């Protein structure tokens, strides 16, 4: 299973409190900050809720030898 790179690209000022709390739960505090999250239904649901505030990219897991 891959990972998702989530980048905070638009300010949450003026949006509902639950959207701001979702950003905080994902570990996003500052604009243009990126975090890596596992690609699972829980994270996908959070991202769906704030899709207008973030950019999401799929990242493949590194191969460990």
UniProtKB/Swiss-Prot annotation:
Annotated GO MF terms: structural constituent of ribosome
Domain of life according to the entry: Bacteria
Keyword terms: Ribonucleoprotein, Ribosomal protein
One GO cellular component term: cytosolic large ribosomal subunit
SUPFAM superfamilies: Ribosomal protein L30p/L7e (SSF55129)
GO biological process: translation
Database matches in InterPro entries: Ribo_uL30_ferredoxin-like_sf (IPR036919), Ribosomal_uL30_bac-type (IPR005996), Ribosomal_uL30_CS (IPR018038), Ribosomal_uL30_ferredoxin-like (IPR016082)
Family in the record: Belongs to the universal ribosomal protein uL30 family.
Assembly: Part of the 50S ribosomal subunit.
Protein name according to UniProt: Large ribosomal subunit protein uL30
Organism: Chloroflexus aggregans (strain MD-66 / DSM 9485)
